[in-house]
Each structure stands twice: as structure tokens, then as C-alpha cells.
Amino acid sequence: MCIRDRYMPYTVELGRSFVSLDYQNVRKNSKSIFALDNLWDGLGALTVINPDVRYFFGKMTMYPSYIRIGRDMILYFLKKHFDDKDHLIVPIHPLSYEHPEEQLAKIFTGADFREDYRILNREIRHLGFNIPPLVNAYMNLSPTMKLFGTAINDGFGEVEETGILIAVDEILDEKRVRHIDSFVKEHPEALHITSGANKLIYKDRA
């Protein structure tokens, strides 16, 4: 079955997310530490209100100003652990590493995701950087995330965007409890899609 039949009817495309300036600085606003949580809460609610949603399709963005060896390490790590073996989607002009793949392979010698993740986090910090927040969040959301490669977005500041697909029912339990189950507990009426969801979304029509 092709991606058009198996995935597209049950997939929500994730648009570009942006954290408001008021929430980007922890020192100025303590609520900023919850900005990403709010994003996941919204996606969790979406899966409850729209139970036919099985997949999230979107992209992770990195900027050309990010240190090159760090970018290559992140992309190599993602490919090693999340590469789409089925080639469901491929970039027309895929982005290549700027450092030899053999050099990157020698860095990630862990036996599993957790060991390699610790290596990645350590090496990126040694460079004086952090793993980009959204990239870090996505790679820790589901062990079966599919990675579709990376390409340059010429129409959006030459950013480097990596395509991903996440199966909703394979989101890690801790994330599910935090962002999906919590919504159901607070809004049980959302489970009754035809009778309750609209009242939840459009309170003035309740």
C-alpha cells in the first residue's frame, strides 16, 4: 500500500511552530519553560478530538548558523536511529554531511539510542551549543519515528529541514500520560466527539 492510501488519510501535517518572544527568555518569564509543553498539550488534545488521526507529519528545522560539525552529528544520529527503511518520502535535493561519514560513525559507538543520545548531548555541549529544543523534543517523543532526510528550504532563509513521521499510538508512555491522558481527564466530554467536542472548542455555542 502506498503512502497516499496508508498514511495520508490519517495524517495531520504539523505547521511551523514558533515560541512567542515573551516566552523565550526564562529570566524574563518563568512560563517560558512550559512553552514546548503547551505545544505538545495542543497536539495531544488534537488526537483526542480527532480520533482518526494516526500520524503526525512535519519537519525539524536547523539554521545555517548552527555549528557544522554539530549539525552533522545530529543528522547522523537521527539517521542511525530513525532512518526510514521504506523510503516513503525522499528529498529531491538531499543535504549531505560536510564531514566524512566515517568520522561521524566513530563518535557514535553506543549500543542503543540512549547511549548514543548521551554521546550526542555531551559532544554538542563540548562545542558550546545545545541540541535545538524542538529537535531534542521530537527525537525523545517516539522510538519508531521515521526520518525522511534533510533538504534546504530556499524560500525560508536557507534553513535545513528534516522530514519526520510519528505514529500517534507509538508515542512514549510518559509523553502520552503527560500530554494526552491528562487532557482526557480534564475534558472527558472530548471523547464523545459528536456530542462533546464542539462544545469544548466553541464554548460560546455550548
Language model features with spans:
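Intrinsically disordered, low-complexity, positively biased terminal segments
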Residues: 101-206
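Phosphate/diphosphate ligand-binding glycine-rich loop within oxidoreductases
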Residues: 1
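Acyl-donor binding region in acyl/amide transferases
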Residues: 4-145
